[in-house]
């Protein structure tokens, strides 16, 4: 069974509903993040979900928050069920609510969000490859190496920010100069440097586990001292492209641990961008298997 919506009967106020997460206010300082099993492709959310997807994303994010803790503070307050439920109203421990929250919930501290998607690309693929083929630029910036092939590694990872769109709208790629206009030059520079540092640390670790992190998206907030804090989800198959190092081959697109099964199925059935679509059960199962494969490879733990 998958959980595509949560309903806490108003015990906590629902303040936001994203493509995957339902966000509730716990008190004036803290939020409850609940990762549902919703999945979207081509900016449309499917009517059914991938069983346990939200749990896998949550546990993988917790792993990476812990791994990156020497590099940056994060917004986690409580990340295991015992700690989470201890900070919630006792009524939410009733089975009706507990079954919606177990294994997929985090309590996080509120921060002032920096309104940028901090995207870091280590390998040339997707929209970056299309742009490079046409103009030898990525994100409007000339690339030094004019002989890159699809899926090649960049000489050094590059920061390519985008706007943070409301649900139902598209994130828009922007230049670093435009990003600096939105958040200020100082914060923009800090975000760029930190995002590349975090990506590089994670990429090097994942390579040891047989996973290539081709690119990823970070989100940051600011604490009371105007210091950067890592927020949202971190280095999951929803926010990153993960490739299998064993099958990696320059010069072509790579199979990734993400929504590719779903995208391919939608395309084959002419359902791109259509609302109200339910996945075939087989697609949901195959997608879950990919998420688990990524989780197990990176964490070294079996998914129970």
Swiss-Prot record:
Concerning CDD domains, the annotation shows: SAICAR_synt_Sc
Pfam families per UniProt: SAICAR_synt (PF01259)
Enumerate the UniProt keywords alphabetically: ATP-binding, Ligase, Nucleotide-binding, Purine biosynthesis
One annotated GO molecular function? ATP binding
* Catalytic activity annotation: 5-amino-1-(5-phospho-D-ribosyl)imidazole-4-carboxylate + L-aspartate + ATP = (2S)-2-[5-amino-1-(5-phospho-beta-D-ribosyl)imidazole-4-carboxamido]succinate + ADP + phosphate + 2 H(+)
- Give the metabolic or biological pathway: Purine metabolism; IMP biosynthesis via de novo pathway; 5-amino-1-(5-phospho-D-ribosyl)imidazole-4-carboxamide from 5-amino-1-(5-phospho-D-ribosyl)imidazole-4-carboxylate: step 1/2
Query: Which family does this protein fall into?
Result: Belongs to the SAICAR synthetase family.
Q: Mind telling me what this protein is named?
A: Phosphoribosylaminoimidazole-succinocarboxamide synthase
Its EC number is: 6.3.2.6
GO-annotated cellular components: cytoplasm
User: One GO BP annotation here?
Assistant: 'de novo' IMP biosynthetic process
